[in-house]
Regions:
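Extended hydrophobic secondary-structure segments that form protein cores and membrane-embedded regions
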Residues: 158, 205-210, 243-249
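Basic- and aromatic-lined ligand-binding clefts that recognize polyanionic substrates
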Residues: 198-231
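Glycine-rich, aromatic-flanked loop segments that form ligand/cofactor-binding clefts
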Residues: 19-41, 64-69, 78, 83-86, ...
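An active-site-proximal structural segment forming one wall of the substrate-binding cleft
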Residues: 102, 130-156, 176-199
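Histidine-acidic metal/acid-base catalytic patches
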Residues: 1-70, 170, 183-194, 219-412
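Surface-exposed, active-site-proximal loop segments in enzymatic domains
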Residues: 45-49, 80-94, 118-136, 163-176, ...
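Substrate-binding cleft and catalytic face of glycoside hydrolase catalytic domains
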Residues: 103-127, 157-168, 202, 212-213, ...
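Conserved beta-strand positions in the central sheet of alpha/beta enzyme cores
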Residues: 72-75, 112, 158, 275, ...
């Protein structure tokens, strides 16, 4: 093949993209509670070791593109759209008004707001630092985000304590820091109660998002399980208002099974929001789009969620690759991410109804015939052949993932 001129590259990518097929319409995509974050659509490709590869994108452009794709919901950090110096000013009110108008004009809803408490230099020691002035500022930021959330009609507020911890052990007294962090959440919840009453709206669902490491060396609430313990610790004045926003990749980063972490959140009644992406176990936070690394694991995750009635939100918290152009972000990256999720979601529905999996599962639950429930050898023998069904269920899920259950085969 000859080198492709720059003027012909978009048409080539577009032609090959259409040739892939399997796409859903914007109307079909809107049926799912999928949310598009401002930070993902506007990500320029920058990282600790990387310069940006894309041009800046405004929130107006991101929202318009999401509408065209069929992503029905939008989410943002406060400073994704409002410069830190303009917070708490009339400029903030003007920007929030523009956002509201843009969402309305494009038929989108704001589903979630979150506060940046990790990037600005004021948070160099974290949002629960020793200085009462830093903690007061952090609390004001959280309360301000709650206010913005109600102004935009959001349902959720997310908290990511990525800078809550320490670089140097011994410099921070952990139990005190946990109490200070709880004070910030308590301030946000109290403000929410008051602001919701003013707007005649329900209070927001406040969702904590865990991450085992990065950017802080040691994060004090590194896992979803740690956050469940924190919520139940007695430090929160309104624990009923606080739940979880697990992120798929954050669970993989510390070697966990995301499905098991989600199961524990479901059991606690605290799975309220879910950040979806993909990546590699025990690696850093690469934020690859859903289904590109672990599609079988994702199928199993969605089987669990569908089985327990969790239907969203599903927040596309990923970074379009640095190799993808500004055009490609919205022409290829986001549409294909949404379509992979929908396909996996519908596959999960098929798996739940699959007669082979259902009969195998029922048989395992029924167990074998045992005459003496205290005879360990008899119990072992009674289930010896039946337990082979575990592997067969795994094989059947593989067949569903590849469409083999519908008769697809390969000629060899």
């Amino acid at each position: 093949m000859k080198p492709i001129p720059a003027s012909e590259q978009i048409s080539l990518v577009d032609r090959l993209s259409k040739a892939c097929g399997g796409t859903y319409t914007a109307e079909q995509r809107r049926k799912y509670f999928i949310t598009g974050p401002q930070w993902a659509g506007a990500y320029e490709g920058q990282a600790l070791f990387h310069a940006p590869t894309r041009k800046p994108v405004t929130f107006e452009e991101v929202i318009r593109h999401y509408a065209e794709i069929g992503i029905g919901y939008w989410a943002t950090h406060d400073t994704d759209v409002i410069p830190a110096g303009d917070l708490f000013t009339s400029k903030q009110d003007e920007i929030v008004g523009r956002i509201g108008d843009t969402l309305k004009a494009n038929g989108l809803a704001c589903s979630m707001v979150t506060t940046e408490t990790f990037y600005h230099a004021v948070f160099s020691a974290g949002p629960a630092a020793e200085s009462p002035y830093v903690r007061q500022y952090a609390a004001e930021r959280l309360k301000n985000t709650v206010k913005i959330g109600h102004q935009l009609g959001a349902q959720f507020a997310v908290y990511w304590p990525g800078s809550f911890g320490y670089q140097i052990q011994g410099a921070v007294e952990e139990t005190q820091a946990l109490r200070w962090y709880a004070d910030g959440l308590n301030a946000a919840c109290e403000a929410d109660i008051a602001i919701a009453a003013q707007h005649n709206r329900p209070t927001l669902k406040h969702c904590m998002e865990a991450k085992p490491f990065e950017p802080q060396a040691e994060i004090l609430l590194p896992t979803s399980d740690a956050m469940l313990s924190f919520i139940a610790s007695g430090l929160l004045t309104h624990p009923e208002m606080v739940g979880l926003n697990p992120e798929y990749l954050h669970e993989l980063m510390w070697g966990a099974a995301p499905r098991a972490a989600l199961a524990r959140a479901l059991t606690a009644g605290k799975l309220w929001h879910f950040d979806i992406n993909d990546g590699y176990r025990l690696k850093h936070d690469v934020d690859i789009a859903v289904g590109l690394v672990n599609p079988l694991d994702w199928l199993n995750v969605l089987i669990l969620l569908r089985s327990h009635g969790y239907n969203g939100p599903f927040n596309l918290d990923y970074k379009p690759p640095r190799t993808t152009s500004n055009w490609g972000v919205f022409a290829v990256s986001f549409p294909t991410a949404v379509d992979r999720f929908i396909s996996l979601w519908e596959m999960a529905g098929e798996a739940i109804e699959d007669p082979i999996i259902r009969e195998a599962t029922d048989a395992l639950k029924a167990g074998g015939v045992v005459s003496d429930p205290r005879d360990v050898n008899a119990i072992t023998e009674a289930h010896k052949e039946l337990l082979t069904l575990h592997e067969l269920i795994g094989h059947r899920l593989f067949q569903i993932l590849l469409g083999l259950h519908r008769g697809r085969t390969y000629s060899v």
